[in-house]
Swiss-Prot record:
This is Uncharacterized protein MPN_413. To M.pneumoniae MPN_091 and MPN_463. It comes from Mycoplasma pneumoniae (strain ATCC 29342 / M129 / Subtype 1) (Mycoplasmoides pneumoniae). It comes from the Bacteria. Residues 86-98 have a biased composition (Low complexity). Residues 83-109 are annotated as: Disordered.
């Protein structure tokens, strides 16, 4: 996978009617185009550089796993960040005091709303059978 960031894409040469592949396979081309257009590899490369520097300086390296809204993991140099206990959720943020979520409906073919959260709770009415006593045998 060497050097796919420094080299460019394959170049079309008309006199040979072909594309010059300078040691490129389809995966490296995909990686180049992805990092070229989205810039995700810049963050990865920056993290890799920091990793390389820390490997040289023998610092206590901690990788904080990425949270769902952060696309790439942060590098924490001091390990005290991991010793902080996580925040306790206060009872005000508990789900019992929140307003109930609206049922996620679905507009069906007859243009009427289906509510899957409500239709799940529909119970089939049980047929009440009058209880009959066992026939008492005469003494």
């Amino acid at each position: 996978m060497g050097g796919w960031m420094s080299c460019g894409p394959p170049i079309y040469t008309p006199h040979t009617n072909s594309w010059t592949e300078s040691g490129w396979d389809r995966t490296s081309w995909w990686r180049w185009s992805a990092q070229r257009w989205s810039g995700w590899s810049f963050k990865i490369v920056r993290a890799n550089k920091a990793l390389r520097v820390m490997a040289k300086t023998k610092m206590p390296l901690v990788l904080i796993p990425p949270s769902p809204n952060k696309p790439y993991s942060k590098l924490a140099i001091n390990q005290e960040l991991h010793l902080i206990p996580p925040k306790k959720t206060s009872p005000a943020t508990s789900s019992s005091l929140k307003p109930p979520r609206r049922p996620r409906g679905c507009l069906n073919g007859r243009l009427s709303w289906r509510c899957p959260t409500l239709s799940r709770k529909v119970r089939v009415p049980t047929i009440k059978v009058p209880m009959v006593r066992a026939p008492s045998t005469p003494p």
